Amino acid sequence: ALCDRLGITLAEECYSLDRVDIERSSYAHCPRPGGRAQLQAYDAAMLDVAHRLGTEAFFTGVGGDNIFQFTKSARPLVDRYLAQGIGLHLFSTLSDICRLTGANAFRVIREAAKVPRSGTQKYLWVPDERFLSKDAIAAAATSRLSHPWLEGPTDSLPGKAAHIAFLIRTQHYMDVHDRRWPTSTLHPLLSLPIIQACLAMPSWTACAGGVDRAYARRSFAADLPTETLTRSVKNGPDGFAHAIIRHHLSRIRERLLDGELAQRNILDREKLDAALKEQQIARGDDYPRILLLLDTEAWAEGWSAGSPASRQT
């Protein structure tokens, strides 16, 4: 529908297991891990389109949820109370959050009461400890990295502080472009004017009317087709991610249970062994974490080899 509205051609590609090498990291060119195996198939499809169409640059929608404050938190209610006090406007925001989340008013108010107020740290970074060994978790706790950007701002409203935290997360996307590609990758939603405009929006406007990213939807209401404007969910590569694990399960078990990370006591082999059973994979939701660890294993092997050739993609 969007391509029809804009008058541009839609290029459709399919994920292929043939384009995934679990012994190669999708972040092999980066100084830190963070990729997942399914990115290899996505990158391959992008390059196919680039070669076929003579593409010089890809414009992405990366960061949209962060910039437009996609949240189902009670923080906007706290912000509006701190900024404007009690009034009909507060009940309007309460109603918006209830409609957006499906929670009743008592649940939303209870969650709002837990939100830190001014003068305290507004957010905490909670590490994902799934499948990490006790020693690795303890080591990370005693040597936790810090940076001014990671400290919760004490002079902003709690909801806006969370918005800033969302923006910090976009740094993950900013330095992962493989410069060997024949194309550039541009993220227009992360441009400074858009960031500044969205940061200026009160947090409660992001859920106005009981819909997420409300001010972004209103801003483009005249330009987008109804199907796009009212979209609340979208498909992702979850099925393909499951297919990767099922197809390579025995090899994945070998690499994660006996690989570089396990040998360095970074992984909890017992928990991983239980998670990497066929029946558990079928019903579990740990597959993104497993694919991240799998890609990290390949990344660590590549850098441990010490040769640039070992990191070639």
What would you call each of these model-derived segments?
Residues 167-172:
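Short, motif-level signal for alpha-helix interfacial/capping segments enriched in acidic residues
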Residues 176, 182-183, 194, 233, ...:
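Preference for short coil/turn "hinge" residues that link or interrupt alpha-helices
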Residues 1-154, 177-224, 284, 289, ...:
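ATP-dependent adenylate-handling active sites, centered on carboxylate activation for C-N bond formation
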Residues 294:
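Active-site helix-to-loop segments that bind/position phosphate- or nucleotide-bearing substrates
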Residues 72, 226-283:
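PAPS-dependent sulfotransferase catalytic core
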Residues 46, 160, 176-178, 253, ...:
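Hydrophobic alpha-helical segments, principally membrane-spanning helices and signal/leader peptides
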Residues 153-165, 290:
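Bilobed periplasmic-binding protein-like "clamshell/Venus-flytrap" ligand-binding domains
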